[in-house]
Every structure is written in C-alpha cells, then in structure tokens.
Amino acid sequence: MLLSHRTSVNIRPEYSNIIGHMCYAASKLWNVCNYERRRYKELELEKYPDWYYQKKAHKGDLWYRQLPSQTAQETCKQLDKAWKSFYVLKKTVGIKDPNPPRFKQDNIPITYMQMGIQHEKGSDQLRLSLSKDLKSYMEETYGIHEKFLYLENKIFRNMDCIKQLRIYPPEDGKCDLIVIYEVKEPEPISLNGHYLSIDLGIHNLMTCYDSGNGRTFILGRKYLSLERYFHKEISRVQSIWYAQQSGNGIKYPRSSKHIKRIYRKKQDAVKDYLHKVTRWLAEYCRKEGISSVIIGDIRNIRKGKEIGHKANQKFHGLPYNKLYIMLEYKLKLYGIPLIKQEESYTSQCSPFSPEVSKRYAEASNRKERGMYITDGVRYNADAVGAFNILRKYLSVSGKQKELSVTGLKNPEIIKVAV
C-alpha cells in the first residue's frame, strides 16, 4: 500500500543552488520535448514522439544530462501524461476546445525514483544521487563540490521503503517535498454488521449515523467558516491591488504574490482541517469496532442545476473527492472498507418509509433548512439523509438489519481543532 506525506526541509545555500538548477533543467527538458510534440510534422520526424521515443532521443541533450537518468525520464513521462489527457478531452469533448500542454515559464518540481534514493531503515536522512554532468557544472561555475544531496527530516525514520521523492523549487532556504512510501497493507477485518453511514453537505460537512448504538453526530462545521474567511480576505486584497493598477492606467490588472500566498494558505488550511476530521472519524471507527463505512456518492451532483451564484461557489469549492481519498486510505490502514452509495431521494424519504425511492419521496417534509418533519415529529434533515443512505445500501446489497431512529432528532456536534 502506497502512502504520501508532504513536508519541508531546511537546506544549505549550496543545496538550494543545486536543486534550483535541477528544477530549471527539468523545465527546459519539458519545453524541448513539448516543442517536439507540437511541431513533429514540421520537424519531419519518422513517427510521433511519444515517451519511449523521447527518453531515448534526448539522452545526449544538455538538459537531460543535468538530471539523474530516471528523473529526466519521469519529466518526459509527466509530459506524456499531459498529452494523453489532452487527447482524451479532445475525443470526449470533456472541455470545449481544450488547449495542448503549455510551455513552462518557471522552474518545475523534479521526481527522484527509488533507484536514486539511499535510505537506511530508522534513519532521518536521505542521500540523493546527482548526475555526472551536474557535478562538473557546479564545480566549474559555483565552486560547489557536492557529490550527493543529503536531506534530513524526522518523518523519514518511520519509512522503511521510499518509492518516490518529489522535490519542489526551493524558496528562502526551504524546500517542499512529497514522499511516497510503501507500508504493509493490513488484513481486512471480518464483517460484523456494524456500519457507519455518512451524508456529505456544505454546512454540515459530514453527518454520521452509527448503526450499533443509533448515535448521530456532525463533523466539519468549521469548514465553511474557513472558506468564508479566505474568500473575504482574497476579495479584500484583490480590490486594493486592482484599484492601484487601474489608477496607474493598467487595463488588465494582474495578480500579485500576496494574493497567490493567500490562495496557498487557504489550500493548506482546508487540507489540514480535512486531514484532522478524517483522522478523527477513522479513529472512531477503529475504537467502536465498525466493519464498513457507507458514504453518499455526490459526484455529478452539480450538473444541470441552477442554484444561484453564492450556493454555486460553495458547491464548486466542496472538496468531496479529497474527502473520499483521505477517508479511504485512513480507513484502509485499519482494514475497514469505504463504500460509496448512490444517494438519490435519501434526504426526501421518511425514516419510516418502506424503502428509499422516488415513490416514497416527500420533498415537502423538509419545512426548514436542516429540519425534516414527519407525522408531527421533527428530525435533523442531514441525520435522516445519513440514516437513509445506510437503508438504501442494505436494500441494494440484500442485507437486513434493524436500525434505531432515536438519535436522528439531535445529532451531537463534534468539534475538531483547526
């Protein structure tokens, strides 16, 4: 089982120079190969320059030789994936008139493969190989006599088998890394009929129903506050920056480093919060002995809907795919499967209806936002949705289980520190 971990390391000026040069060489290699793909007919090549052709044809090129061999090949492979995506979009019309992969104006990340990484078990240090041409260039140009790159971080101690290391261009003596490592996949736990169902939403990010004790609880209430705060801050800074440019006679205002920094901060804050929420949920499932987690599948929920620009912004910002990925791998570490269930009419059917289907859907029962009323009894609408998702899954899979509705009225709100 492969996992990834994002971190950063402090590096010396010499290392910053070396890594920066490799990222520069990778961007130039990308552009050379991209130009060849765009103009292969004009260049009168014998065949279309795919990855297999380019990794051989450019072996002697200047920029290729500035990188470790597998790193250079991986750069060509990333370009190949980008072109394949372009052709798929063009064929399926996923995007109208898609543009081919662009040329890189800035330095790009480089990827070290397993053969270029030396790591001893339990050590907090990695040793990375450098190409012969790069070492010669650094000695002649900058007087840098490094034979290897050594990166230190305490997270490396718990990684027995590092498969890939993605290194981003250094900034201010720091370098961001994404480490992909392998862990032993745990055995799936035996099914015991104990389920947890999850209804995804905007105001209540995850509303959960535990089939064992009938408990319902809400996770992720802080997500919308984070989104709202950063949207307001971005809007405030943009208005000031664009007004300054307009006052100077600039017709088409450009973004600023400050705005880009806020966007990055927003992404990091949301990602960190999602990790904390999904980690709490995975730990809850482990402690309570839950054998299966059922989650509503809301992919394509936004298609063909006119919901207004405010709600549209919230829907499009909802990182449901990230949630699926984070929750799936965290549960997998405990041997618990994550099952996606189509959730049509789960929020409209009564918890007492014979089945969850269009026949028994009563949208009028949702009198207010967050409130479902049936037979004069008030229930939390999101809790009813989570309850019906589990009912629908049991019906589709041919399983039977008595479920309690006592916890649907007042779900507990779980606060996870931001």
Model-derived regions: residue spans:
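Acidic carboxylate diad motif detector
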Residues: 49-170, 313, 317
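Long, hydrophobic, amphipathic alpha-helical segments used as structural scaffolds
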Residues: 34-37, 41, 83, 87-94, ...
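Stable alpha-helical structural segments in soluble proteins, enriched in small hydrophobic residues
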Residues: 33, 74-86, 383-393, 397
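Short amphipathic alpha-helical coiled-coil/interface segments
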Residues: 26, 75-83, 259-266
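Well-ordered beta-strand positions in beta-sheet-rich domains
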Residues: 4-8, 147-148, 164, 195
